[in-house]
């Protein structure tokens, strides 16, 4: 996954949208944005199936609404490694990838870092 951005970070319908949503079909591969260690691969309410990866120095990424996990907590992953498959789990209206970046636990706009 990682095609066209279909929803940006920021206010959306009066609610702060904490990440970027990418167009994806159920089963499309989801790749790690950077190397790191898998913190969790669980179902978490509205996020549905979510993977969190700790990249060090306070940087954590989240990949949500997945249909399948390809990694488990404690796994080391490389940049570009398949970590799961896109889906429509949790609170969403269609399959897509929700991607979040947190720095020291605070949601940040991923665009600022992906463009560097």
Which sequence ranges carry the predicted segments?
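Catalytic cores of peptidoglycan-degrading enzymes
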Residues: 2-116
